[in-house]
Amino acid sequence: MKMGLAALIALLAGAAAAGEPCREMRHEGLRHVVCEARAGDDLRLFLNAPDGTPFGSFGRIDAALAAEGAALEFAMNAGMYHADRRPVGLYVEAGEEAARLVTSAGPGNFGMLPNGVFCIGQDGFAVIESRRFAEDRPACRHATQSGPMLLVAGEVHPRFIPGSTSRYLRNGVGVSPDGGTAYFVISRGRVNFDGFARFFRDALGVRDALYLDGNISRLHAPGLGRSDAGLPMGPVVGLVAPR
């Protein structure tokens, strides 16, 4: 079979990109970094180090993984937390629940219902509205609660305002309709909630997505030459691979 040069270049470029989980995408004039995990990947949540203190940084997590011959392919902050880095809502790590589910409305973004839970299951991923999660709780190897939901069944959160001037750096997670792919997104600039939600729906084809946080949002993506520093973090989600 003959293949044109342009087609061959495209094929090789796609093969090269397949090994890098993170890429930059543009939507409505704004840039976002998108990192993907697939069902079967070693995607984990991290909170406390073996000594019981919060990891707080990508570097400490990577150092702990080195002891098992592994490293972070990418990572980002994964939900809201108190001043001592305890999760605000549900937190499950390696099957152990460290913080309970919160289903009541409350102050701030977390309490802007509907909020939701990101679940890493045995066979894939899910983003589920918190009260629905409470009614029919799936088996989650890892789970983190945050808020607000960005998308519920393809619909933008009802309290988001198109054209809002409340623009911040933001990060979130969405799941493909078949549950086989999780998309972790961080904006490269300031974006409002409505625009961020529509990126998941219109650029990634996601129907359910969850906001993770705003100004403190950080990304570790060695393949992009990026590892953001800052104040100590609470929960972190990361894709783990052999060194």
Where are these regions (language model features)?
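Sec-dependent signal peptide recognition
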Residues: 1-8
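Short, solvent-exposed aromatic-acidic interface loops
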Residues: 50-53, 132-136, 186-190
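Short acidic-glycine loop/turn motifs at beta-strand connectors
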Residues: 37-41, 119-124, 152-154, 175-180, ...
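Active-site-adjacent helix-turn-beta-strand microarchitecture at beta-sheet edges
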Residues: 86-160
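Small/polar glycine-rich anion-binding or flexible loop at a beta-alpha turn
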Residues: 26, 84, 212-220
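Zymogen propeptides
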Residues: 17-109
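N-terminal signal peptide c-region/cleavage motif recognized by signal peptidases
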Residues: 13-15
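Conserved, well-ordered active-site substructure
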Residues: 88-104, 159-170, 175-208, 217-243
